[in-house]
Curated annotation (Swiss-Prot):
Family: Belongs to the phosphatidylserine decarboxylase family. PSD-B subfamily. Eukaryotic type II sub-subfamily.
Organism: Komagataella phaffii (strain GS115 / ATCC 20864)
Membrane-protein topology: Peripheral membrane protein
Pathway connected to this protein: Phospholipid metabolism; phosphatidylethanolamine biosynthesis; phosphatidylethanolamine from CDP-diacylglycerol: step 2/2
Known partners and oligomeric status: Heterodimer of a large membrane-associated beta subunit and a small pyruvoyl-containing alpha subunit. Interacts with pstB2. This interaction may be a means to structurally tether the donor membrane (ER) harboring PstB2 to acceptor membranes (Golgi/endosomes) harboring PSD2 during PtdSer transport to the site of PtdEtn synthesis.
GO cellular component, as recorded: endosome membrane; Golgi membrane; Golgi stack
SMART domains documented for this protein: C2 (SM00239)
Active site: 734 (charge relay system), 793 (charge relay system), 880 (charge relay system), 880 (schiff-base intermediate with substrate)
Pfam family of the protein (one): C2
Lineage: Eukaryota, Fungi, Dikarya, Ascomycota, Saccharomycotina
Name this polypeptide is given: Phosphatidylserine decarboxylase proenzyme 2
Annotated EC: 4.1.1.65
PROSITE patterns, per the entry: C2 (PS50004)
Amino acid sequence: MSQAFNLVLFTEIKQAQNVKTGNDKEPNSKLRAIVRISERSSKKTPRATPRDDFVYTWNSTISLKLRSQLKLPLIQISVWDKQAHRSVYVGEVRFFLIGLLKSLAYNEHTSSWESTPQWYQLYSSEDKKSFSSGTILVQFRVQQHLSKKNLFFNAKSDVTLSDQTGSSDLLNQYIQAIETSTPRSLQKKAFDLSNPNEQRFYPDIETNALASSILDCEIDSMLEDFTYRKPNITESSLHDDTLTDTDFESIHSDPTIPSSALVPKRILFIEILSVTDLPPYKSFTRATFDMDPFVVISFGKRTYRTSWRKHTLTPVFNERLAFEVCDYEKNYDLQFSVLDKDKFSFHDQVATGFVSVSELLEEKTTDKPCTDFKPTSSNLILLDKPMNANESADNLLDTKKKKYKRNVNTDATLQGGLLRKYELVMSLDGKKNWSRKTKDEYIPILKFNTRFERYEILRRQLWMHLLQGNDTQMKGTLDLIELNYFVDCLGSNLSDKTLASFFEYYDKNPWVGETLTIEQVIDSLERLVFKRQCANTHENYIINIDTCPLCGQGRLSLRQDLDILKHLSICASRDWSTVNKVLKPSFVSSKAATRRWYSRLLIKLTFGQYTLGGNSANILIQDRDTGYILEEKMNIHVRLGIKLLYKSFDKANSRKIKTLLRKLSIRQGIKFDSPSSVSQIPSFIKFHKLDVDDCLLQLDEYKTFNEFFYRKLKPGSRPQEDENNSNIATSPADCRCTVFESITFAKTFWIKGRNFTTKKLFGSFYSREMADLYDECSIGIFRLAPQDYHRFHSPVTGTVGKVQSISGEYFTVNPMAIRSDLDVFGENVRCLLPIQTKEFGRVLVVPVGAMMVGSIILSVKENQEVKKGDELGYFKFGGSTLLVLFPNKRFKFDSDLLANSNNKIETLIKVGMSIGHTPEEPQFERHYRSFEEEPVDQQLRIIRCITGGSTFEESKQATQRRNELLGNEGSPQEKDLQVENLSWEAKNMNLEELEENESLLLYDLVNDGT
């Protein structure tokens, strides 16, 4: 991100006077100043000796590169007395970086932002606690710096520095970027650390950058380990640029996603109890069975794995996990997989089961909590009687054994709620050729308990427990002094005025000793939490601790106080005495959980880090329908080539590489337009496991490979969500999408190309009118992989404007290239296709060609009326991208797409899915359909997507072969009774529609001993 700005902070240390040195006996002390930014980079000045008037003069300028990802946005200038064998600390001055940058003024003559020289008082840090005196004269200047690389690449143009920066707003763009990338809590901490406390000491950075004091408070056993900091904001300071709390709130602009769908409202607890009736794998010696099972649980972007049990067919786990569920995740499935641990090879898949989270989240009254509840999944069995959380100890361990055989007894007052006990009938892995006897004899059943709670209920239980522990006299009430002591023990900085408002709400006067009941205090705290959630304000924090006293997790003070409350509520709601282990997310995807350590090491060394949102050759995306994390299918040599090519900006931008990619793309396009290219179609389908059922034509009707590549689909195969509502925009393509509320956010999180701007995107067609419309527009990036359907459609209803074509290069649109220094969207071949709409204004669709793309073909003309979902054009062979630009004041993207994009995760969507809406229109709500309600073809698609089974065409051929074998022509021939003749569905699924016919073949094969 810093490479997009190339800003450098020049700090000119001029003089220091009236400084008390480290050794009064040495009149000729030598002082040195060190400038440090967020402990990531620092430089020092030369030594300076005093003049007769004890004035130290440096006149030295220190340059430090400004990065938009800072651990702490803080500038520290410390002064040291250099002696013979050691350096003695003299004092320091600190600056809040964001406030300092906003105080700089732009100088048009030097094309830089400058401050006037000012004297600043030196203070001591709290850990030194030495007497500091004197002042230091400092001046700051920020300027864009062009490195040798930048100068080389811009050598062909006569662009001036001011042209490259765009305008004097570049610094404001950087400030906005750093505010976006730096958590709100860290900005508040940096502001606190830049102000000395009442004793004229700076809060300590070295020992604890996020807390200045540790106060031992004992509310009860829940609070005895809390460490927190007291607020250290002074009312006045000798800094000329000192900022108050109000100033801090006014200079901060925290971009948020204004949607309740992103706020987790509930927590789901799952206890993995046991698995029964696992099939015996034969060991290497064939003398006994080999089964060391463990369970992998996948939900959305989270994957958990239990510990493994040695040599057993009925493992008992007794392990618990908890995860948040957002509104947009209610339609996701919860996947359970049982695997057999192998020491040297891949872990073997044994059985798989799926449960809809919406079934587990159904709320019931306390009178009849579960008797009328019937899960829709046929393989999910809910036991008749629900259990209380405290009664679940019969199925779990009674106590938790820790080190040195010490029993830990936990108070279970927070363990309310009912546990539902389920038995999930799992399917044996379809990729293994189980015998009919094995399938009939072994039916694995996973036993687990679930309980879900809403966050507000967990918080109220937490408040009740803490307040009861603080009520030492058992009065059940608190006055203002007791309430103030309680919030101080939590590390809160709530003012007396805020606490007094708790009493005023109930018409009570806190200043005459009137009290509130514990329930009234809880209601007041919940009103405060609700107010902060709605207004998204962070003026005060309710709780601030460093370490959780229950699970021991540290660095909690890096989070917002509401996040700390969530963490404590979850920890407090767990019954630690009844479980062996609490699971934490361990893997990126369920596929990664099956790999051995050396496989993961090889993938990391070859393709890069295997992580969600990582900039590597491992492309992981999230399926919007199911929530599963999928790994994009790509040839190994292509994956390695992209990594080697685009990890180096010099190579990718060289003239040879550009020429090579252009020739390769044109040559490949000509090759796939030839009739001989038809032979490539079957291998392409087989490698990418494509579903060809939706194709409008049969495979033998395509004359060239390109005709198949930009194939049309059958009518109705891509239905439009809320088709008659023109206030909702839909996806223009089957693609992997990322969306952002502005170009600035897109450059911060995703597009890392040097100097990417809308001006460069529009090329010679850039105008003032387009600048006003699109300079700060909402942008959607829809990337099409080679295996996707390559026709693109209109996302809105409107009139097509004048289409402009822009020639360019043929760089790949792979995420690794987009997140490199290369400006792919500003240099690749592209078209500008405007659509004038009533609801959204002027929407701009930009088809961008990429590597191997022969051409971009448009199907619409100027002034043509298009409806949402109408075809606009198609790409010939290769990867490609669609950019869709909306005026941000008239459009909002869907919250789930924004959440993934801000985490640098692409979302897999299809044509017709909702992507956004007008500000007045509510977000389109997707409804869950159970697996059993889907038609058979759709069930096959879902399982193919998850398991990576064979293609549908192969399945059809196998089915036809089966009908021939079992048709009216007589009994099948023995030579035809081979396992290869079975369809993929028969090998991988246990559908009732296929079981009867396929079982005949399986039975005969078993009897024949094949």
